[in-house]
Amino acid sequence: XIAGSEEYGKHCFKGAVADAYLAKH
């Protein structure tokens, strides 16, 4: 990958996990 793309993917993944966590709590 592209380094920037991989970092963006990690950021989006963390954001999705955070949203799911907040939705449950």
From Swiss-Prot:
Classify the main location.
plastid
* Presence of the UniProt keyword Signal in the record: no
What are the record's GO terms for cellular component? chloroplast
Return the EC number: 6.3.1.2
GO MF entries: ATP binding; glutamine synthetase activity
The answer to keyword Nucleotide-binding applying to this record is yes
Q: What class of enzyme is it?
A: ligase
The reaction(s) annotated as catalysed by this protein in its Swiss-Prot or TrEMBL entry are: L-glutamate + NH4(+) + ATP = L-glutamine + ADP + phosphate + H(+)
The UniProt keywords, alphabetically, are: ATP-binding, Chloroplast, Ligase, Nitrogen fixation, Nucleotide-binding, Plastid
Where found, per UniProt? Plastid, Chloroplast
What domain of life is recorded for the organism? Eukaryota
Q: How does it assemble?
A: Homohexamer.
The UniProt similarity line reads: Belongs to the glutamine synthetase family.
* The protein's role, per its UniProt record: Plays a key role in the nitrogen metabolism of microorganisms, animals and plants.
Q: What is this protein called?
A: Glutamine synthetase 2 isozyme
